[in-house]
Design a protein with these regions (language model features):
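Membrane-embedded alpha-helical segments that form the functional core of polytopic membrane enzymes
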Residues: 2-25, 69-74, 110-127
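Transmembrane helix interruption/hinge and helix-loop junction motifs
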Residues: 8, 60-69, 106-115, 165-174
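Solvent-exposed interhelical
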Residues: 20-55, 123-158
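C-terminal ends of transmembrane helices
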Residues: 26-35, 76-90, 129-137, 186-194
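Intramembrane alpha-helical segments
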Residues: 44-109
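Membrane-proximal helix-loop-helix units in multi-pass membrane proteins
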Residues: 86-97, 109-140
Length: 195
């Protein structure tokens, strides 16, 4: 019994840590698009954001390597989906980095682990696009809910989350449980307002 509780706590902490690493990096990369009354945690960390992101990811990778690797790589691959033929700092086109990230995840943790992480990340991303539909219409790049339609994006997001649940029930359920806490901490609601 106690080993089961320990494992569940370890898994939750691993998911929180990798989720926070992904969110910090995403907020850092999207800092030009940030608005609102409060500074997110990534902005408050300033130049230290990369160090704290790596620290958070390292903790997750130590606690639950296969989940940390595949969730991070799936987030990276999904983040590159819209970049198509753009040349990235690596010199590679975005589509090739997407394929390489997915292949690395499959090699490191197996197809089922990588597929479940990819389905989870894409499902969450689609729902995020649905929720942010009104806000994101002012950005230069349309999100998927704007391209496909809100209902279509919501249905696709739900289907992907069910696929993730089928492939990796514990990771998906715990991930959905941890996600609001990651978003809360990353939003840093306890801090200063923009001035």
């Amino acid at each position: 019994m106690s080993s089961g509780i320990f494992e569940a706590c370890r898994d939750i902490l691993a998911l929180f840590s990798v989720g926070l690493a992904i969110k910090l990096m995403d907020d850092h990369l999207d800092r030009e698009e940030a608005d609102g009354a409060r500074l997110p945690l990534a902005a408050r960390l300033g130049r230290g954001v990369c160090a704290y992101t790596v620290l958070s990811y390292a903790l997750a990778a130590w606690l639950k390597p296969s989940w940390a690797w595949t969730l991070f790589l799936a987030s990276y691959a999904c983040g590159m989906l819209g970049s198509g033929a753009w040349r990235l700092p690596s010199g590679l086109p975005g589509w090739l980095e997407t394929v390489l990230a997915f292949a690395l995840g499959v090699t490191a943790a197996g197809w089922r682990e990588m597929a479940s992480s990819t389905a989870f990340v894409m499902g969450v991303q689609l729902w995020d696009d649905v929720v942010d539909f009104a806000h994101d219409r002012y950005l230069t790049r349309a999100n998927l809910a704007q391209r496909w339609g809100r209902v279509e994006a919501a249905l696709a997001g739900t289907a992907l989350l069910f696929i993730a649940l089928f492939l990796a029930a514990a990771k998906t359920l715990l991930g959905l449980l941890v996600l609001p806490w990651v978003l809360y901490v990353a939003a840093a609601p306890w801090g200063k307002e923009r001035g």
